[in-house]
From Swiss-Prot:
Gene3D superfamilies: 1.10.1200.30, Delta-retroviral matrix, Human Immunodeficiency Virus Type 1 Capsid Protein, Zinc finger, CCHC-type. PROSITE patterns: ZF_CCHC. A motif (PTAP/PSAP motif) lies at residues 124-127. SMART domains: ZnF_C2HC. The lineage of its organism: Viruses, Riboviria, Pararnavirae, Artverviricota, Revtraviricetes. A motif (PPXY motif) lies at residues 118-121. This is Gag polyprotein. The modification Phosphoserine is found at residue 105. It comes from Human T-cell leukemia virus 1 (strain Japan ATK-1 subtype A) (HTLV-1). GO terms for cellular component: viral nucleocapsid. A lipid is attached at residue 2 (N-myristoyl glycine).
Amino acid sequence: MGQIFSRSASPIPRPPRGLAAHHWLNFLQAAYRLEPGPSSYDFHQLKKFLKIALETPARICPINYSLLASLLPKGYPGRVNEILHILIQTQAQIPSRPAPPPPSSPTHDPPDSDPQIPPPYVEPTAPQVLPVMHPHGAPPNHRPWQMKDLQAIKQEVSQAAPGSPQFMQTIRLAVQQFDPTAKDLQDLLQYLCSSLVASLHHQQLDSLISEAETRGITGYNPLAGPLRVQANNPQQQGLRREYQQLWLAAFAALPGSAKDPSWASILQGLEEPYHAFVERLNIALDNGLPEGTPKDPILRSLAYSNANKECQKLLQARGHTNSPLGDMLRACQTWTPKDKTKVLVVQPKKPPPNQPCFRCGKAGHWSRDCTQPRPPPGPCPLCQDPTHWKRDCPRLKPTIPEPEPEEDALLLDLPADIPHPKNSIGGEV
């Protein structure tokens, strides 16, 4: 049984392996210009043909769409032939850069096989990205975002910096296919970019909207509310299209690098008071922001996005995620950090028992608290005495010598200079 392909295609179909991202975006842009729009079957046949074309030795870099059209078999299924025809026409309309004049060479050109002479330097060509244009005929109908659509778009721009050509081409394709309102574009910005990039984009968009409202836009009625509110109406297609162009143009003021500065990584500690965290942010922004950059929008954004989870829940519950800083401080002033130290639980003492102790036979205490020593389980293995333990056996104690008699002790106290009687020859004593 054959496969069934639906008419609703993924917002950004995945490119075939081996094809550059900007080339695949050109194929997608040409496919979205078809009337009626492309289906999943058309994208499937396009990827299948590109896989075969990339394996042929006749592949040229940059891609030559006329050569690809000559490689397409006759009667190939799908609308690949129409897609290549649109690319050939668009490539012919884009003026190519003039080639640099050939370098002056001496009369005797060195042979190409000479290993001592390097080949001439060829300047690498920049990736050619076709401009995004809306298809001919009726504009696309508005469709709200779904989570799978946002995930597919974020996966495509994960390696590209905000404002880069690949990033803008992917975003334009998504805007062209879904025709989002101002609320949808705000949700897309918060899902794709960091809080810092979203704050900078919001500042640039506000200035562009103010300039456009002053200049005047076709279909804009100042009495009906701001341009952002009127662009949320799905029936205002022309006015919504103007807002989409302003929203895309606001990315031009973003830096080319997606790396956030050091003050963007300041986070609130688990037990840090909210006002101390905001004070640290304020000092870091004063020392790190370039001159002329507004500080309040960035401070409000970081005060919510970099706060801990408990403060974020308080701000979100009271609707102060992007409110003035004073309201955010008042919302979190009653919050106190939880004490994380362990509290020793003191168990209440049990009343003394009425029964007698198993050891001493007296009442008023438990046997584990008895002061009387525990009796031995049996007689001593040394002396067979059942009243003491082996460690207390008298046989293990050293013997103390007996004291000398009292007479000997008295003799020791006699003076030593008394002369002893001697027997002489004369018989004198």
